């Protein structure tokens, strides 16, 4: 059990039998009335985000989430196979569980897998990943109608928007949370 004063981003709560992760929270002390905590909760299974308000001091049940260091091995149909770094056990995780970050998974990439009661909840990739551009068109210097970016296909098959000066074969640093371009990796 956790008190509302123990809330922090990333804490997983058990509300109405559902696992909810705190994405954002704010303690509010109005001029009149009791204090409360306003939160944004993400359903760990479905990914749906909801707003929920708790009265200050309320006890809420927390879920024990075990984060394990794992290595991504390979893609098998609609599943992704990972190996536990300590026990060397292999587990398959569905594409639905991994979500949109699956497009940035590269073989032998170190990731963290959150587990609850032996079942994988979600996969956390490093915030920035280094991937090579396999295809992009030549960007014309005078072409500014697109805001100075062009599409590029990465070695994982993901397509991202990159600046015009990026060429095929360049190694890029990409934000795995939203797919945005962070910079070029110096070779």
From Swiss-Prot:
Main location, first listed in the record: cytoplasm
InterPro entries on file: Elong-fact-P_C (IPR015365), NA-bd_OB-fold (IPR012340), Rib_uL2_dom2 (IPR014722), Transl_elong_fac_P/YeiP (IPR020599), Transl_elong_KOW-like (IPR013185), Transl_elong_P/YeiP_cen (IPR001059), Transl_elong_P/YeiP_CS (IPR013852), Transl_elongation_fac_P (IPR011768)
Domain of life according to the entry: Bacteria
Pathway: Protein biosynthesis; polypeptide chain elongation
Subcellular localization, as worded in the UniProt entry: Cytoplasm
GO CC annotations, alphabetized: cytoplasm
Example GO BP: peptide biosynthetic process
GO molecular function: translation elongation factor activity
Signal peptide: none
Keywords: Cytoplasm, Elongation factor, Protein biosynthesis
Family: Belongs to the elongation factor P family.
Function: Involved in peptide bond synthesis. Stimulates efficient translation and peptide-bond synthesis on native or reconstituted 70S ribosomes in vitro. Probably functions indirectly by altering the affinity of the ribosome for aminoacyl-tRNA, thus increasing their reactivity as acceptors for peptidyl transferase.
HAMAP family documented for this protein: EF_P
Protein name as annotated: Elongation factor P
Species annotation: Nocardia farcinica (strain IFM 10152)
